[in-house]
From Swiss-Prot:
Main subcellular localisation: host cell
One annotated GO molecular function: RNA-directed RNA polymerase activity
Name of the protein this chain belongs to: RNA-directed RNA polymerase catalytic subunit
Gene symbol of the encoding locus: PB1
Family: Belongs to the influenza viruses polymerase PB1 family.
């Protein structure tokens, strides 16, 4: 029987059909090769937007710098970065007038956070530019290397473990005449393999000391490494993103903490909340505008797009904002917060790996590192690359480019949101002093603008005024990419609003499926995704039931664990059949052991082991939840784990799922090939670092972990904690006298060893 597809939509309100227009199936595009070209594009564009600014030279590094602030007022609609300081300050003042005490209170909250933040805050985050090795590293390793170098250069404030003290070291390091660092290098030699008698290349890792003079050190401290942004859909061209080094990160973190505290108090800010909370916030603003537009008023909404948001932002604007926001605060606080924008005004962008050349005829490939771009003959490059390099040459120093204007992607999301909201705030009638008025929503570079006026001319005038006001602070609303609609239909941060937010369930499609962590986690994540979508995204009961059946099917195919009584032959079926036959209570077998599925949409919140526990054979329970089972290498499992799920749009989201430790929670072993490379020493460092952190967390469970431990070292803190805990346990009879004595002896031994060292 043929079904007329239009019948499917008879009972569905039109806006729900958005899920059927979903274009993003399949994998997103990834970038290959070097990001050097994209970074050059960014640098050249940024300078072009600010080209009428003043050029100066940095006295310390010799880098040429362009300052567009208080530059010429725009005469056309081209994007430009000429923000006017007095306009920015005035916008801040009006924002404070509309929200009395907002800056004062946010500063107090931030000061409290600064006093308590530990330096391990910087181990969060993925790739980080490691200035000691001049390349990217995992955040924890980069931090460890930085601290190691600081200590060997006599900078020891960081030993207190507080982030603010580490930052004192950073500031001091910039005044030093030279810094001694340890770098890794590779030696390659050709040797004959005893077994195969073939020649093989053997790599050995050496560490060598190197001295950096003040200028070289400053350049590295101010460097942002660049990479290509991966997995961006809907774009033909890739673009560059920045990874800052450890010197900048801590300062940025504190500025963003302040800005986050401000954003939380602003009803027009789409950050830092997300999900349903964000939708509620936005719906309120829309409701306010629609209620206030009486029958006589028109209300229109612009789904806005800004041209090159961060390339037109300027660190100097942020410095002005911070100076104003913190104006009545203690000196130390103002200084700490103003360092991030100052560093960004003097930042250097690293050009990445450089260019790859290959000669087809001679089968040769060679890499031209970024350092050589200053001197190499340009005849080897094609037209467009040649133009890029010519433009960038005056800015080059040692393979990095001086990039004073612009912000690089994703650095000051919160603070730039405050700037955007301050312009939305100026739309109140008491400020526009005319018949039109506006309000809206801002989330980093994304905005929605709602304009109310008695007639169409008024709407037009309101939009124009908003547009021009934005120009004055370096925000460029794109007239080509923004569109206007009667209020009630618009899009903001991929949320579609049509008389209420429309659940776009198809956005979540890529996160349905088997994650590939291990059998235990995958089952848990799979059902949690379905549960979350029923709660948040209008996933209906029938569809959810179908999604669940598809997921179980997918899971069985992935792990080859079809039911014990199935006819399907796989590598595992022989073992699973045997298990099926010798199990008395077959209902108790997990799906991954060839059991049947007990999940339905009512019990998705219960981990599978708990769901089937009462139904299991006793010996099966014993095998399944046996931490000494020799066939399983265990992660230590918290009761709640975090998984990263990929929605189709926007960043990967962290999602909590219940973790029950069983023999199915195995961890795959690491690929051995890394052990033969230059990364090996780093890997060992990282593992040692990880072990120390884990040990520390054992002594200080997370509740007491964030409090500063005074000036003692980690070891001292752990020893004193062990003594206190042992005494309490001994006095309450939880441990015997011998055990207590042994613990005390171990503590004394550790202290003795420290003294000898």
């Amino acid at each position: 029987m043929d079904v007329n597809p239009t019948l499917l939509f008879l009972k569905v309100p039109a806006q729900n059909a958005i899920s059927t227009t979903f274009p993003y199936t399949g994998d997103p595009p990834y970038s290959h090769g070097t990001g050097t070209g994209y970074t050059m594009d960014t640098v050249n564009r940024t300078h072009q937007y600010s080209e009428k600014g003043k050029w100066t030279t940095n006295t310390e590094t010799g880098a040429p710098q362009l300052n567009p602030i208080d530059g010429p007022l725009p005469e056309d609609n081209e994007p430009s970065g000429y923000a006017q300081t007095d306009c920015v300050l005035e916008a801040m003042a009006f924002l404070e007038e509309s929200h009395p005490g907002i800056f004062e209170n946010s500063c107090l909250e931030t000061m409290e956070v600064i006093q308590q933040t530990r330096v391990d805050k910087l181990t969060q985050g993925r790739q980080t530019y490691d200035w000691t090795l001049n390349r990217n590293q995992p955040a924890a390793t980069a931090l460890a290397n930085t601290i190691e170098v600081f200590r060997s250069n006599g900078l020891t404030a960081n030993e207190s473990g507080r982030l603010i003290d580490f930052l004192k070291d950073v500031i001091e390091s910039m005044d030093k005449e030279e810094m001694e660092i340890t770098t890794h290098f590779q030696r390659k030699r050709r040797v004959r393999d005893n077994m195969t008698k073939k020649m093989v290349t053997q790599r050995t890792i050496g560490k060598k000391k190197q001295r950096l003079n003040k200028r070289s050190y400053l350049i590295r401290a101010l460097t942002l490494n660049t990479m290509t942004k991966d997995a961006e859909r809907g774009k033909l061209k890739r673009r560059a993103i920045a990874t800052p080094g450890m010197q900048i990160r801590g300062f940025v973190h504190f500025v963003e903490t302040l800005a986050r505290n401000i954003c939380e108090k602003l009803e027009q800010s789409g950050l830092p909340v997300g999900g349903n909370e964000k939708k509620a916030k936005l719906a309120n603003v829309v409701r306010k505008m629609m209620t206030n537009s009486q029958d006589t008023e028109l209300s229109f909404t612009i789904t806005g797009d800004n041209t090159k948001w961060n390339e037109n932002q300027n660190p100097r604007v942020f410095l002005a904002m911070i100076t104003y926001i913190t104006r009545n605060q203690p000196e130390w606080f103002r200084n700490v917060l103003s360092i991030a924008p100052i560093m960004f005004s003097n930042k250097m962008a690293r050009l990445g790996k450089g260019y790859m050349f290959e000669s087809k005829s001679m089968k040769l490939r060679t890499q031209i590192p970024a350092e050589m771009l200053a001197s190499i003959d340009l005849k080897y490059f094609n037209e467009s690359t040649r133009k890029k390099i010519e433009k960038i040459r005056p800015l080059l120093i040692d393979g990095t480019v001086s990039l004073s204007p612009g912000m690089m992607m994703g650095m000051f999301n919160m603070l730039s949101t405050v700037l955007g909201v301050s312009i939305l705030n100026l739309g109140q009638k008491k400020y526009t002093k005319t018949t039109y008025w506006w309000d809206g929503l801002q989330s980093s570079d994304d905005f929605a603008l709602i304009v109310n006026a008695p007639n169409h001319e008024g709407i037009q005038a309101g939009v124009n005024r908003f547009y021009r006001t934005c120009k004055l602070v370096g925000i460029n609303m794109s007239k080509k990419k923004s569109y206007i609609n009667r209020t009630g239909t618009f899009e903001f941060t991929s949320f579609f609003y049509r008389y209420g937010f429309v659940a776009n369930f198809s956005m979540e499609l890529p996160s349905f499926g088997v994650s590939g962590i291990n059998e235990s986690a995958d089952m848990s994540i799979g059902v949690t995704v379905i549960k979350n979508n029923m709660i948040n995204n209008d996933l209906g009961p029938a569809t959810a039931q179908m999604a669940l059946q598809l997921f179980i099917k997918d899971y069985r195919y992935t792990y080859r664990c079809h039911r014990g009584d199935t006819q399907i032959q796989t590598r595992r079926s022989f073992e699973l059949k045997k298990l099926w036959e010798q199990t008395r209570s077959k209902a108790g077998l997990l799906v991954s052991d060839g059991g049947s599925n007990l999940y339905n949409i009512r019990n998705l919140h219960i981990p599978e082991v708990c769901l089937k526990w009462e139904l299991m054979d006793e010996d099966y329970q014993g095998r399944l939840c046996n931490p000494l089972n020799p066939f399983v290498s265990h992660k230590e499992i918290e009761s709640v784990n975090n998984a990263v799920v990929m929605p189709a749009h926007g960043p990967a989201k962290s999602m909590e799922y219940d973790a029950v430790a069983t023999t199915h929670s195995w961890t795959p072993k690491r690929n051995r090939s890394i052990l033969n490379t230059s990364q090996r020493g780093i890997l060992e460092d990282e593992q040692m670092y990880q072990k120390c952190c884990n040990l520390f967390e054992k002594f200080f469970p997370s509740s007491s972990y964030r409090r500063p431990v005074g000036i003692s070292s980690m070891v001292e803190a752990m020893v004193s904690r062990a003594r206190i805990d042992a005494r309490i346990d001994f006095e309450s009879g939880r441990i015997k006298k011998e055990e207590f004595a042994e613990i005390m002896k171990i503590c004394s031994t550790i202290e003795e060893l420290r003294r000898q060292k």
